[in-house]
Amino acid sequence: MNRLEVLIPCYNEMATIEQVVSEHHKLLNDSKVFDDFKIVILNDGSKDSTLELITSLSKKLYKIEIINNQIPSGIFKAFNQLYNQSSFEWIYLTSGDNQYPAKILENILNNFENNFDLYVAKRVNKFEIYNLSRQIISYFYRFFCFMISGIDPIDPGSTKLLKKNLLNEPLFCRYLARDAEIVIRTKKKGYKVKAIPVEFGNREHGKSSATKLSVLFKTYFDCLRLFKYRFF
């Protein structure tokens, strides 16, 4: 079977999570691309009403599963937790803040071909959404990954639709650079990768941790592990 598992980590996303889940659920319920689907929501120790909202949603909509962490684990561990527990043939990880609305997955599904293994949502409107510092960080992240590995990760921080078996082997990276490594390793192994141009949205509530110095340093040091792909 061709089944899709949508993975949504969330932390204090009560303002957006209901819209995110409902719109993705409707899209997949109407779509004929996959034989079956489910939406797995990881509440990573939210302090607001996120858990109550998604619990209520799971009673109204079918094919929704909830994982609840009592204590926040952080975005990296939340990603890994979702990837590790996934069981369907295809997985798609998106955010609970609606920066990647359901129309992005819809765009990918409209361009879906069975002979591709990984679809990368390539954000074409970064200059409209990001401020200057965020643009610089995004540019150098991609450039640094390319210089270290010799392979273009396309848009390393963006969402992806991929076959679960691409994650069967352990990754070298130990932090957020794993997102880039997934694309780099997939291309290096000769699998087919397709970039889909998309427009993502502003983060309307909360604050991204991507620009924190501690996160940036850890991510860029993590990128150094990509050097192994020069000899892979």
Language-model features: where?
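Cell-envelope/extracellular polymer assembly enzymes that use nucleotide-activated donors
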Residues: 3-5, 38, 181
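C-terminal catalytic/acceptor-binding lobe
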Residues: 190-232
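Short, well-formed alpha-helical segments that are part of the catalytic scaffolds
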Residues: 13-29
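Conserved donor nucleotide-binding strand/loop of the catalytic core
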Residues: 38-40, 51-85
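Acidic helix N-cap motif at the loop->helix transition within catalytic regions
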Residues: 15-19, 48-57
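Acceptor/aglycone-binding surface of glycosyltransferases and processive sugar-polymer synthases
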Residues: 69-85, 90-93, 102-176, 203-213, ...
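A conserved acidic beta->alpha catalytic loop
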Residues: 43-51, 98
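Catalytic donor-sugar/metal-binding loop of nucleotide-sugar-dependent glycosyltransferases
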Residues: 151, 173-174, 183-201
